[in-house]
């Protein structure tokens, strides 16, 4: 068969890109140089960033950098192998011990990222003949892990405990095992799961619960712990990686069965050392940990928005084009607030996702609020 130019790989990609462009959904990588104190440089502009998950500003903390530098000099730039071969460095082992203690669990397991953690956890615990119930606004990696498990996967409406109960009543009797997946703080809306009610349902229906704490660690009160507590090292802890905290038997099982741990290189020792030092700071500086939520609530009060439940505040715009235009207008005024568009959020709910950090000051927060009141009065109302 002779090649068909219209069916080439480049033609296929070009057609798909044209469709994304027409819908204002094409993504582009923008080089961004992050600095301390919420500073960022992009496109030759010096900006104040409100689009970073470094909630405590620890990525630039001299103590965290010093810990990473020391580990880099001692252990090298990379782990060099899978953790089950020779890639299980001393900083990794120390970090797992501290994470488990912080979460009140027997053990912890560190993965290469939060996404990799969730790709590995569900398939190691459930499979065909089992049931997964997942909040419809759960992160993409929760859905990816559920799909890889081959368990029956059913979505429940966001934070809808009544529907979750109904689905458990409908499906639990025919499933060997059941796993509920949710988030402590939802990454795009900044709201929180009703964990006491969810955990009570899990107990009633003999189900396990995994809580993704990627955006909650260290910046919101944890409340009741789930049997499976996973999260990332890349947000509050300012480093890179993911983890699961659970009982020792569960961690032992995942060490053998989580494919996203077994078949990939271990986390660089410097990343583990940085996260360990950051966890020290989280535990010993509670006033710093409280600051992002306080700033978020200052912002929502200023704009008359519902009180923030976390350091994440969505400013809903609607159309993707309008969200992009508002982001561009804010950048011209010195603020970096990236537009979030489908498929990350549902169609018609494009938004600015404003993320607050201990590195921000009140003046920066107030200035952003005033700019939004002027540029997007239909999306906010001055309080």
Curated annotation (Swiss-Prot):
Any GO BP annotation: biotin biosynthetic process
Residues at which substrate binds: 27, 34, 139, 344
Residues annotated with N6-(pyridoxal phosphate)lysine modification: 235
UniProt keyword Oxidoreductase present: no
Binding site for pyridoxal 5'-phosphate: 114-115, 187, 212-215, 232-235
SUPFAM superfamilies (alphabetical): PLP-dependent transferases (SSF53383)
Keyword Lyase listed: no
Molecular function (Gene Ontology), one example: 8-amino-7-oxononanoate synthase activity
Key words, A-Z: Acyltransferase, Biotin biosynthesis, Pyridoxal phosphate, Transferase
Top class in the EC scheme: transferase
Pathway(s) per entry: Cofactor biosynthesis; biotin biosynthesis
EC number: 2.3.1.47
InterPro entries hit by this protein: Aminotransferase_I/II_large, AON_synthase_class-II, PyrdxlP-dep_Trfase, PyrdxlP-dep_Trfase_major, PyrdxlP-dep_Trfase_small
Family: Belongs to the class-II pyridoxal-phosphate-dependent aminotransferase family. BioF subfamily.
Function: Catalyzes the decarboxylative condensation of pimeloyl-[acyl-carrier protein] and L-alanine to produce 8-amino-7-oxononanoate (AON), [acyl-carrier protein], and carbon dioxide.
Protein name: 8-amino-7-oxononanoate synthase
Species assigned in the record: Methylorubrum extorquens (strain CM4 / NCIMB 13688)
């Amino acid at each position: 068969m002779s090649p068909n130019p219209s069916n080439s790989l480049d033609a296929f990609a070009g057609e798909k890109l044209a469709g994304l462009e027409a819908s204002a959904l094409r993504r582009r990588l923008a080089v961004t140089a992050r600095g301390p104190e919420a500073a960022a440089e992009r496109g030759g502009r010096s900006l104040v960033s409100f689009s970073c998950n470094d909630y405590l500003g620890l990525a630039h903390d001299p103590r965290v950098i010093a810990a990473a530098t020391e580990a880099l000099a001692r252990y090298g730039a990379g782990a060099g192998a899978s953790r089950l071969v020779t890639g299980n460095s001393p900083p990794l082992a120390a970090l797992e011990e501290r994470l488990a203690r912080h979460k009140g669990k027997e053990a912890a397991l560190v993965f290469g990222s939060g996404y990799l953690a969730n790709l590995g956890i569900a398939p190691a615990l459930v499979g065909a003949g089992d049931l997964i119930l997942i909040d419809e606004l759960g992160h993409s990696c929760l859905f990816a892990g559920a799909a890889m498990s081959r368990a029956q996967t059913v979505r429940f409406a966001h934070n809808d405990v009544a529907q979750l109960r109904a689905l458990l009543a409908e499906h639990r009797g025919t499933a060997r095992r059941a796993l509920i997946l949710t988030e402590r703080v939802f990454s795009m809306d900044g709201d929180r799961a009703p964990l006491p009610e969810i955990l009570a349902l899990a107990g009633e229906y003999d189900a396990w619960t995994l809580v993704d704490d990627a955006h909650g660690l260290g910046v919101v009160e944890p409340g009741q712990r789930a049997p499976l507590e996973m999260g990332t090292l890349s947000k509050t802890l300012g480093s890179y990686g993911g983890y699961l905290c659970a009982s020792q038997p569960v961690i032992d099982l995942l060490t053998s069965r989580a494919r996203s741990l077994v078949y990939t290189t271990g986390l660089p020792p410097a990343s583990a050392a940085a996260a360990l030092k950051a966890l020290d700071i989280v535990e010993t500086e509670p006033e710093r940990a409280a600051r992002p939520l306080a700033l978020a609530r200052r912002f929502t009060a200023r704009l008359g928005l519902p009180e923030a439940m976390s350091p994440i505040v969505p400013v809903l715009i609607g159309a993707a084009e309008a969200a992009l235009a508002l982001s561009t207008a804010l950048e011209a005024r010195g603020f970096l607030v990236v537009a979030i568009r489908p498929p990350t959020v549902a169609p018609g709910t494009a938004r600015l996702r404003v993320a607050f950090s201990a590195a921000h000051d009140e003046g920066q927060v107030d200035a952003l609020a005033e700019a939004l009141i002027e540029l997007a009065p239909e999306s906010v109302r001055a309080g």
